[in-house]
Swiss-Prot record:
It comes from Mus musculus. The keyword Membrane does not apply. It is found in: Cell projection, Cilium; Cytoplasm, Cytoskeleton, Microtubule organizing center, Centrosome, Centriole. Interacts with TEDC2. Found in a complex with TEDC1, TEDC2, TUBE1 and TUBD1. Its main location: other. GO terms for cellular component: centriole; cilium; cytoplasm. Acts as a positive regulator of ciliary hedgehog signaling. Required for centriole stability. May play a role in counteracting perturbation of actin filaments, such as after treatment with the actin depolymerizing microbial metabolite Chivosazole F. It comes from the Eukaryota. The lineage of its organism: Eukaryota, Metazoa, Chordata, Craniata, Vertebrata. PANTHER family: TUBULIN EPSILON AND DELTA COMPLEX PROTEIN 1 (PTHR35076:SF1). Residues 342-369 are annotated as: Disordered. Keywords: Cell projection, Coiled coil, Cytoplasm, Cytoskeleton. This is Tubulin epsilon and delta complex protein 1. One of its GO terms (biological process) is positive regulation of smoothened signaling pathway. Residues 276-340, 377-409 form a coiled coil.
Length: 420
């Protein structure tokens, strides 16, 4: 009897500990009491969960950029983010923006985000304290996949608007490049001036954070507090992984408390049309008309096809056709070789898939273990060459299409835009 009672008490303590560990992992995580109230759909838990989902779904909210928004705007951002990620429950989207309803649905949305991907790992990576100057994380694209299907726009697109958007994009891209160049110059100066000041021989120089600690000792205390907070989050993540099963068992009970009027996956009702007896006769007459049209089309197309085959029957032979066929085969082989080369370059394991610390090394010194800047530049240059080649090919295709359209419309003059 005592053993059974202790087992029940242990299971009762495991759930609050699991929820508390999850709360410590999340940014500005709510208390476990909020989770308990959300299970019973209490209205006081809804505002806290709206803010939590905003911080989880929006990278800008981590910097307190969107936390000052009105509750209606926060709810709109959360709904659009969940919809873009394919959230299956439409019940949450039906609640009015900024209302205190649907705390249980918000809890289900949070659990869906936790179950579908490495959410905690991404949040921990965003709040990680950086002690060294690191190379920004980037991922080499692998196979681009099939092209996206063409979607006809609902309204005509103004060409001036497209040109204006392209101009804004180019301007922001140039601003980004100039800021990156300025940052690289400042980093190089710091690494050069602090050469030989680091205790580790493999590094040799100080980073920006370490230089800031020497310049302002109070920032060292802030950095220490940030490291302690990060350790607390990492310990909470480890505890969450040990007690995760208890939380998901509890979420099963939360899902069971949902009313039958709000099923897990809503679907549009299907209506079958009713066909009367008169409609069957009309369908039969339409079928006969279609068959007659098919026979007429076959009678017209067969003579034309025979005449076309007789006209081109002697073509495809001779030295000119063999030379053109050989040129086409060589072009196809070159294109396949270029595609294979870009695939091999994008799938090499030596490319950076995580942040790397920037270390200044002297000429002729032994290379440390890590990623060299020359390798990154070489990879990016090869990728740039492949993209430029694809761009030139698309431009040629567009020019050929414009020439074809100009030939089809003799009364229209096509004026190409000036090259930039």
């Amino acid at each position: 009897m005592r053993r059974r009672r202790s087992r029940v008490e242990g299971a009762a303590r495991a759930l609050p500990e699991a929820v508390a560990a999850l709360s410590r992992c999340l940014p500005a995580g709510p208390s476990p009491e909020i989770f308990r109230r959300a299970k019973f759909d209490r209205p006081e838990a809804a505002p806290v969960l709206w803010q939590l989902l905003l911080r989880v779904l929006s990278p800008l909210a981590a910097n307190n950029t969107w936390t000052d928004l009105a509750p209606e705007a926060q709810a709109c951002v959360v709904k659009s983010a969940l919809g873009s990620q394919g959230y299956p429950r439409s019940v949450l989207l039906q609640f009015p923006d900024g209302s205190s309803q649907g705390s249980r649905e918000l809890l289900l949305a949070l659990s869906w985000l936790l179950a579908r991907g490495p959410l905690l790992e991404q949040l921990l990576a965003q709040t990680r304290v950086q002690l060294g100057d690191q190379l920004p994380q980037w991922e080499a694209p692998t196979s681009p996949g099939p092209p996206a299907p063409f979607v006809e726009p609902k309204s005509p697109v103004d060409l001036r608007l497209v040109e204006w958007l392209m101009g804004r994009l180019r301007f922001r891209w140039r601003c980004l490049i100039s800021s990156q160049q300025e940052q690289c110059i400042l980093l190089s100066k710091i690494h050069l001036y602090t050469q030989g000041c680091h205790s580790q021989q493999s590094l040799g120089h100080l980073s920006v954070a370490e230089t800031e600690m020497l310049r302002d000792p109070e920032s060292g205390q802030q950095l220490l507090q940030a490291l302690e907070s990060e350790n607390i989050r990492l310990e909470a993540a480890l505890e969450w992984r040990r007690r995760e099963l208890v939380f998901w068992q509890w979420m099963d009970t939360v899902l069971d408390t949902c009313s039958p009027e709000t099923p897990a996956v809503t679907s549009q009702p299907t209506f079958l049309p009713e066909i009367s007896e008169g409609g069957l006769g009309e369908l039969e007459s339409v079928k006969q008309e279609l068959q007659a049209l098919q026979e007429e089309l076959r009678e017209v197309s067969e003579p034309r096809r025979a005449a076309w085959e007789a006209r081109v029957g002697g073509l495809g032979q001779g030295p000119e056709w063999s030379n053109s066929r050989k040129a086409l085969q060589e072009a196809v082989q070159q294109e396949l070789a270029a595609l294979q080369g870009s695939w091999e370059q994008s799938s090499t394991p030596g490319q950076p898939q995580r942040p790397h610390r920037l270390v200044r090394s002297k000429d002729g010194a032994p290379r440390p273990q890590g990623l060299q800047a020359a390798e990154v530049i070489r990879t990016l240059s090869a990728k740039e060459a492949c993209l430029k080649k694809a761009l030139h090919q698309l431009q040629r295709q567009c020019q050929q299409e414009l020439a074809r359209l100009a030939g089809a419309l003799p009364g229209l003059i096509w004026i190409l835009p000036p090259e930039h």
